[in-house]
Amino acid sequence: MSSRVLTPDVVGIDALVHDHQTVLAKAEGGVVAVFANNAPAFYAVTPARLAELLALEEKLARPGSDVALDDQLYQEPQAAPVAVPMGKFAMYPDWQPDADFIRLAALWGVALREPVTTEELTSFIAYWQAEGKVFHHVQWQQKLARSLQIGRASNGGLPKRDVNTVSEPDSQIPPGFRG
């Protein structure tokens, strides 16, 4: 088990029990790490150092300014969970896979490196809306995972590139060619 010791002064528990006043008097900064069975057990702190630490904690607990900020500025509203229809249903335009879709896909044997893009999801929904078939939510997610697996297989498992972007030539010479 790894651990971090927060003081350079280390002593065994037996030495602390034998003469705690001398050990604490020699401690740099008023703190000693006490070890038992070669592992840190606790810290021994002098009363003066404890008073300093408590005063520091109290000072940090008080606001540094008298300006109070409105909590509403920092609290973002929770996203309302989308209700998934019970039982079988036909594909609809606002359908979304679960938030942990990539993990679920891995459980189904489909390793997805990238999350579903909006283009991929829109294409999937449009296709299955036209088909008019009905499946359970989990079955729709499995179909989406397989669809992504097949669609991305031709591109090394990544989403397809945008056909409207201008490609940049690379300047590397393939092995076996002279440049």
Curated annotation (Swiss-Prot):
Pfam (any one): DnaT
Keywords noted in UniProt: DNA replication, DNA-binding, Primosome
Single GO cellular component term: primosome complex
Stretch list, region Disordered: 155-179
GO biological processes: DNA replication, synthesis of primer
InterPro entries associated with the record: DnaT, DnaT_DNA_bind
Family: Belongs to the DnaT family.
HAMAP family, alphabetized: DnaT
Subunit details: Homooligomerizes. Interacts with PriB. Component of the replication restart primosome. Primosome assembly occurs via a 'hand-off' mechanism. PriA binds to replication forks, subsequently PriB then DnaT bind; DnaT then displaces ssDNA to generate the helicase loading substrate.
Function: Involved in the restart of stalled replication forks, which reloads the replicative helicase on sites other than the origin of replication. Can function in multiple replication restart pathways. Displaces ssDNA from a PriB-ssDNA complex. Probably forms a spiral filament on ssDNA.
Name this polypeptide is given: Replication restart protein DnaT
Organism whose genome encodes this protein: Escherichia coli O9:H4 (strain HS)
